[in-house]
């Protein structure tokens, strides 16, 4: 009897163990899924869905090795005031914060996750089924559609009610429309062939097709997990969207947002290694029916022809860590920044080759770029993060492709703004102290800093109105407003409240291509911009 009871007890214990083991595994799996989702919902839009970094540092087992869980919890709870990261105390529970820290310290950088053409197709959402029902003209008072300025409002937490594209009449400085985007809006592109359409891309790689006449999204598509890259072709028929995660770009029908073709971004980098690459800048050009895209990690620029098969020309050994760029000479020449080489490479998009590599300060970040014509010369202005002692704005003669001057400024810089009708080039100062509140003004003729504006908050992404009369500046995530200045007197004329404003995009960009040039100058200097092919 005792033996029978003993065997029964053993059987019960064994059975319970067999039952409990999968339950324990399931609980662990459930926890892993829970904290993965917490990361996706609260962190990934800045830190990258693959835990490899994006706007903010990588968060994974390798990068967090040796970091105290207590210190990490403190950062999550309190935020980091000189960055985009807000305090999560009160938004996430203490248990969730502790679990998230543990999850981050155990999770490796993920392999390049897939987001296929079928995934893209399935992600399309249609909000207006019959676009013929949309109004034939704007439903609000505006003299010229180019007077519209769009602002990418991130929202405090990079998602939620404050995340939206906000559109403003730059003559009156009044909001005329808001389009919720769910997650942080990053960039706004306008259709060069049809002024009613805008395309808003978020940090989570969603694209919203926006009707500017009725100020509403008509459809959207998710093109990846992270990455701001987007361009619209000169005929308005195509969009090219690139991702940091996954490492690809997708060609879309600009009307329907249906995917046409994906491009896997990989190649041999300047050091001879075969690499898979993030997408850097993407740009359409008035010069030709092409797109140019930077492969950040491979150091290549690809030129995609918009004809049957969409063939690709690969321009190699451009530079290490390519990011942003701007166009000049009617869109034939591309100026692209190389972070790690501290140069800007000039590329001829007709001949598909590098013209020259120009000195560009330290960690150049040219933003949307700026170029002005002064005394018959086309001058380009290049900002740079300045992660060294050399905090300058580079000025190049874009006709001769040579450095004219490097202008000392108060810190690193991120995005220059210019206009043909305004006297100054505005540059935003990036810093971890009060300098981050400021924007400096460079006189176009003397090439000297002549004034510093104390905008407040975290001032960045200056942009002129289409007529050049007003300068718009985001006061950012600690200012929660856009501040407007008279372009000549530099007096403050308006403030426009919104949650964590970032990039500012004038509708006038489609006419002058690069900020600081005018349509008349382009036509006079470069002839007919409608075609390059003879």
Segments the model singles out, each with a brief description of its role:
Residues 130-139, 184-190, 226-234, 272-282, ...:
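Repeated scaffold domains used in trafficking and secretory/extracellular systems
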Residues 45, 50-54, 59-111:
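Extracytoplasmic electron-transfer domains, predominantly the class I c-type cytochrome c fold
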Residues 475-534:
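Blade-level signature of beta-propeller repeat domains, shared across WD40, Kelch, NHL, RCC1
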Residues 145-147, 194-196, 235-237, 287-289, ...:
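Short coil/turn segments that connect the beta-strands within blades of beta-propeller domains
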Residues 170-173, 211-215, 254-257, 305-309, ...:
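Short loop/turn segments that connect beta-strands within beta-propeller blades
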Residues 25-38:
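Electrostatic cytochrome c docking/interface patches
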Residues 222-299, 311-314:
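Asp-box/WD-like beta-propeller blade repeats and closely related beta-sheet repeat scaffolds
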